[in-house]
Amino acid sequence: MKVQILGMGHSLPERILNNQELEQMVDTSNEWIVERTGILERRIADKDTATSDLCWQAAKMALERSATEAKELDLIIVGTSSPDMLFPSTACIVQDHLGARNAAAFDVEAGCTGFIYALGIAEKFLLSPEYKKILVIGADLCSRFTDYTDRNTCVLFGDGAGAAVVGKGNLGPGILSSYLAADGSGGKHLYMPAGGSALPPSKETVEQRLHFIRMDGNEIFRFATKIVVAVSEKLLSQAGLSYQDVDLFIPHQANLRIIKTAMKRMRIPAEKTLINLDHFGNMSAACIPVGLSMAEEAGKLKKGDLVLMVAFGAGLSYGGILLRWGRDQDVF
């Protein structure tokens, strides 16, 4: 039995925030942003849009593409760092909106690795006979926690959501290997100080701007360039494959320099690497599922293609999924 992706979906806000607009907001320039990040523009949700809104929109597309009804879902997992509220979970809000009454629902908070964590967890659930179809979503409204007076972080982030319906198939296409990991000692390099039980919201935390993303970019760069290669090697080794076998490499879209460094070390060419951060920025947990969904939509994937997905994020969390693209005709 293989765990297969039965259908993908994505949702992106309409509003585009380009580098020229950011030039008017902070001390930066289009040239500075492009040179250091590779980003030209990003999508920003309007004030009335919540993470769950993008989630259910992406989910509806995935359900339609997989020919799945909401009532068939056994579980919904949402990977997000920007839930609608502390509770109930965003997954429960999505479950209600979709009318997926038979599905259990919970969120996973693994930063930008959220979708990979959620998909890896779904894979394990599907090894049980109780679960047949699971909706996995990676979504974040990073703009809600971005400090638009900090030029080092405000140029990076965008909003979006990607979804996958996963199920069981016979031997053939499907997940070949998965790996989830974390290094909690690096948590201090990427975090949001206030808003939790350690430092609850207060007048003081708001005045001190403690509800925004804090990041040590140099530390994250050093971590990411090593870990992307290490995770990729582990996934391919587990499956008895090599870099030369990869048809599509989908890395987390944090920074173009990180991606190019990984490509060079792994000798994966540009034509086999998905890069969309130039138009969408870092959408956190949404990067990989949005990329995969749009690649399928554009006809860039064919059955049998080997897809390598690797992410890293706050925690510091990291992980990856290696899969053979496609689905059986007799999915049950």
From Swiss-Prot:
Organism phylogeny: Bacteria, Bacillati, Bacillota, Clostridia, Eubacteriales
Gene: fabH
The protein's role, per its UniProt record: Catalyzes the condensation reaction of fatty acid synthesis by the addition to an acyl acceptor of two carbons from malonyl-ACP. Catalyzes the first condensation reaction which initiates fatty acid synthesis and may therefore play a role in governing the total rate of fatty acid production. Possesses both acetoacetyl-ACP synthase and acetyl transacylase activities. Its substrate specificity determines the biosynthesis of branched-chain and/or straight-chain of fatty acids.
InterPro entries per the UniProt record, alphabetical: ACP_syn_III_C, ACP_syn_III_N, FabH, Thiolase-like
Domains: entry comment: The last Arg residue of the ACP-binding site is essential for the weak association between ACP/AcpP and FabH.
Predominant localisation class: cytoplasm
GO biological process, one term: fatty acid biosynthetic process
Subunit structure: Homodimer.
The species this protein was found in: Syntrophomonas wolfei subsp. wolfei (strain DSM 2245B / Goettingen)
Matching PANTHER family: 3-OXOACYL-[ACYL-CARRIER-PROTEIN] SYNTHASE 3 (PTHR34069), BETA-KETOACYL-[ACYL-CARRIER-PROTEIN] SYNTHASE III (PTHR34069:SF2)
Family stated for the protein in its record: Belongs to the thiolase-like superfamily. FabH family.
Start and end residues of each stretch annotated as ACP-binding: 253-257
Gene Ontology cellular component terms for the protein in this record: cytoplasm
Keywords: Acyltransferase, Cytoplasm, Fatty acid biosynthesis, Fatty acid metabolism, Lipid biosynthesis, Lipid metabolism, Multifunctional enzyme, Transferase
Active site: 112, 252, 282
Name of the protein described by the UniProt record: Beta-ketoacyl-[acyl-carrier-protein] synthase III
Keyword Transferase: yes
Transmembrane segments: none
